[in-house]
Amino acid sequence: MASLIYRQLLTNSYTTDLSDEIEEIGSSKSQDVTINPGPFAQTGYAPVDWGLGETNDSTTVAPVLDGPYQPITFTPPIEYWALFAPNDKGVVAELTNNADMWLVIILVEPNVPQELRLYTLFGQQVNLTIENTSQTKWKFIDFRKRSQNDTYILENALLSETKLQAAMKYGGKLFTFTGDTPNAAPQEWGYTTNNYSAISIKSLCDFYIVPRLPRETCRNYINQGLPPMQNTRNVVSVALSARDVISQRVSINEDIVVSKASLWKEMQYNRDITIRFKFANQIIKSGGLGYKWSEISFKPANYQYTYTRNGEEITAHTTCSVNGVNNFSYNGGSLPTDFVISRYEVIKENSYVYIDYWDDSQAFRNMVYVRSLAADLNSVTCSGGSYSFALPLGNFPVMSGGAVSLHPSGVTLSTQFTDFVSLNSLRFRFRLAVEEPPFSITRTRVSRLYGLPAVNPNNAKDFYEIAGRFSLISLIPPNDDYQTPIMNSVTVRQDLERQLGELRNEFNALSQQIAMSQLIDLALLPLDMFSMFSGIKGTIDIAKSMATNVMKKFRKSNLANSVSALTESLSDAASSISRRSTIRTIGSSASAWTEVSTAVIDTTTATNSISTQTATITKRLRLKEMAIQTDGMNFDDISAAVLKTKIDKSTQIAPNTLPDIVTEASEKFIPNRAYRVMDNDEVFEAGTDGKFFAYRVETFEEIPFDVQKFADLITDSPVISAIIDFKTLKNLNDNYGITKQQAYNLLRSDPRVLREFINQENPIIRNRIENLIMQCRL
C-alpha cells in the first residue's frame, strides 16, 4: 500500500548523523524556544568586538570614546557634540563665528556666593558676575554677546556632579546642556545665529567628540560621567590632528582605501542608514461554526523603500523576523460556540527581533570577506493595535494593546532572499523590553499581559523607523567593475517561506487534475522513499542526503510525536496491567489507544460528552490502523498517492523544500477522517470531528452508540478507515441499492470494489473520493 512511505519514515526517522543535527540547529526556524538572555544568546557566532579581558596596569588601552584631545581651536563637524572635561574652574571654551555669535562657557566651583571675577575672553579682560549656591555640584554658565561691542549676558546654566559640558552645531543653531544632573538635557531651542556652520571652538581643556546619534550617548555622559578607562594608569590626551588617523570618525559617509595589493584591496565603508521595517503575521481560523481560531503567529516580512543620504537617493530592502516567541492560548470552553484561540504568539523580554538590511550603495556590492564590522543604532518602540474576532453571533472579543521597545544588541552578516534575488546584507539583532500598555482580550479573562502579540503588531503604521550608522572593512577586487559572488558560508538564515508558499499554492491547485482511477491504482502500490521521490530532478545524485533531510524533518512531525507518546502510554499500560491483572477496567481494555478510562462514567452520559470521548479516541485510531494493517485501503494510502501525483506534476518542487512538504502532507492531508470497527452485523463509526454512528449492515438502521463497547472493540478488533462513510453508504443504498456483500466490501474499503464503482461513473462514490482529494491541501 502507498502508506508504506509513512511507516518507512516513522521507522527510519530516528537515525541521523550528529554533524547533520548540528548543522540543522544553526539554520532551522525555532518557534517555541527557551532563551538564556545574554549579549549573543541567539547566534552561534562570535561577537563583533571582542573584549580585552584582564589588562595589566602597564598596558595602554584605547578608550571607547573618541578622545581625549588636547586644547586647540577647531571647527567642529555638524551634528557632533564637543564634550568638554575641565579639571578646574575658569574658562572652559570660547565659541564664535566672528559675526553675530560670541559665546563663552565658564566653570564655577561649588558654594560660591555672588561675586565679580576677572576672565580673559577672546583676548580681552572682562569682569563677570558669577554665583553657585550648590554645596556639591559644579556650575557651567553660558555668557553670550551678539557683537564685539556688546556686553556679555548670562544665557544658560548647568549644575553638574560630573564636571562635563558639551556644545553642538545642529539644525542652524548652537546647543549646550542645561538643567541639573542627573536630569540634564540639551537646550530646547538653542542659540540662533545666521552662520552657524562657521562657528569655531577654542577649547581650553581636554575634550571628546561624540556623535549626536544615538541621542542617549552624550546625555548619559553628561549625567553619569565618562565610562571607566579599564585598567590604564594614565589617560594621555593627544593632538586633534591625531583624529585623522581614526578615519572612520572623520565623516559619516565615506569610502576609504585601507590597503591595496595587485589582486585585492581593503575598503572601509562608513554609512549612516535609515532602517524601516514592519512585522508580518498570519491569522488562521479553524473550521466549524466560526468561533475558534487555530493560530496567530509572526512571519518574516520584506519591505523595500527609498530615502536620501547626503543628497543621494538610496533604495533599501529589509527583512524583519522574530525569534524566541512565547506561545499563549485562550479556551473559553468545550462547546462548539465557545470562543477559542488555540495558539497566539507574543514577543517579550526573552525574545529577539532580527532586521536584515541591504541597500544599493557600493558597500553592499562585494560584501563577502568582511572585518571590523560595527554599528550604532537608536532604539524604537513598537505598539500593538486592535483586532476584532468576528463571531457569527454575540459581541466580538477584541485583542488590543501591548508594546515592546527594541534595543540594538549586535550585528552580523546575513543573506536576504527576495522574490527575485539573494542579497548579501547586514543582520541587526535587537533585544526587547516590555513597555506600557499591556494587552488584553475584551469579554475574556485575559487582561494586563505584557508583550507584543502577533495579532496586529504594526498598529496601522506603514513601517517602524530606526536611524543609525555602520562601519565595515571589506576585501574586494582592486577594479571596482568586478563583483565577487555571494558566499553561503556567511549566511545566517535562509528563508524558505516564499518558496514554500508558492509550492503550497501549486499543490492545492493540482488537486483538480488527479484522475481517480489512476489514484486508486497508485494507492495500492507499495511506495518507498525512492519511488515516491523519483520524479524530482536530480534525485539520484542526492538521494541519500535528501532522504536524510526528509527523515529528520519528519521526525519532528505531529505524527512522529504521537507515535512516541503512544509508545510511552502502551508501556505504562502494560506495567499497570501486570501490577493489577485481576482488574479489568475501561482503562486496561482500551489501553493507550483510547484514554477513556476517566471519561466513561455511566450509561446516562450526555451526547456532547460522548462526542468528546469519541473524538479523543479517534485521534489515535490512525496509529492503531498503521500498526495493524488490513487488506483494505486507508486514508494514508490516498494521502500518499495524492502526494506522489502532485510531486510528479509539480514544477516548483525542489530537494530543499521537499522535507517541509512531505511533513506537512502527513499532518494536513485529509483532516476530517472517520474510522470504524465491526462486530458481526454491527458497525461503530467515529470521526475526528466528534460525529459518531452505530448501525446494522443489513438495514443501515442506526442503533444506540455504546462507548464502552466501542472502546473494547478498538483494542481487540482491526480498525478500518471509513473511506466510504456511513452517510455515503446510506445515500448509495437509498438511491441505487446495494447487496449485503457489496456493503461489507465497502465497509472494509476494498479497493477493487471502489475501482468498480468509479469505473461505472457512480456519482455518489466519485463525489466522496473527490471530496477526499480536495482535502489533500497544504
Swiss-Prot record:
GO terms for cellular component: host cell endoplasmic reticulum-Golgi intermediate compartment; host cell plasma membrane; host cell rough endoplasmic reticulum; host cytoskeleton; membrane; viral outer capsid. InterPro entries: ConA-like_dom_sf, Rota_A_VP4, Rota_VP4_MID, Rota_VP4_MID_sf, VP4_concanavalin-like, VP4_helical. Residues 512-778 are annotated as: Spike foot. Residues 250-481 are annotated as: Spike body and stalk (antigen domain). Residues 65-226 are annotated as: Spike head. A motif (KID motif) lies at residues 646-648. Keywords: Capsid protein, Coiled coil, Disulfide bond, Hemagglutinin, Host cell membrane, Host cytoplasm, Host cytoskeleton, Host endoplasmic reticulum, Host membrane, Host-virus interaction, Membrane, Outer capsid protein, Viral attachment to host cell, Viral penetration into host cytoplasm, Viral penetration via permeabilization of host membrane, Virion, Virus entry into host cell. Residues 391-411 are annotated as: Hydrophobic. This strain probably does not use sialic acid to attach to the host cell. In group A rotaviruses, VP4 defines the P serotype. A motif (YGL motif) lies at residues 450-452. One of its GO terms (biological process) is permeabilization of host organelle membrane involved in viral entry into host cell. Residues 486-513 form a coiled coil. This is Outer capsid protein VP4. Belongs to the rotavirus VP4 family. The record marks R233, N234, R243, D244, R249, V250 as: Cleavage.
